[in-house]
């Protein structure tokens, strides 16, 4: 099993709880974040740093408000990853739907 987490700040407390539980269960963990020094980035097996501002950062990277740029990049990236994994694993969308879990 694989847990994918998206957190611009990399410090979201509820997601840190999920991360800890996943690690206890021996799951692989991946975090997508703007903050390479965050707790989630340190705890994850793999981390992917997205160059965008999170809603908590002061520096402006985009004219878009708060974490919009991060969320848009995360959507595109995870869609590409999902499509490629489904192709490589020969999983159709019905199987994918049945295996998906949203913890929020």
PLM-predicted stretches and their roles:
Residues 80, 86-104:
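A short, charged, Gly/Pro-tolerant segment at domain boundaries
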Residues 1-76, 82-83:
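Glycine-rich phosphate-binding loops that contact phosphosugars or nucleotide phosphates
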């Amino acid at each position: 099993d694989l847990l994918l987490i998206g957190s611009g700040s990399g410090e979201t407390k509820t997601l840190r709880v999920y991360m800890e539980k996943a690690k206890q269960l021996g799951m692989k963990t991946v975090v997508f974040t703007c903050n390479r020094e965050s707790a989630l980035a340190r705890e994850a097996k793999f981390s992917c740093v997205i160059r965008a501002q999170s809603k908590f950062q002061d520096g402006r990277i985009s004219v878009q408000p708060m974490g919009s740029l991060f969320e848009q990049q995360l959507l595109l990236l995870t869609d590409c990853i999902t499509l490629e994994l489904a192709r490589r694993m020969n999983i159709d969308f019905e199987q994918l739907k049945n295996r998906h879990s949203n913890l929020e």
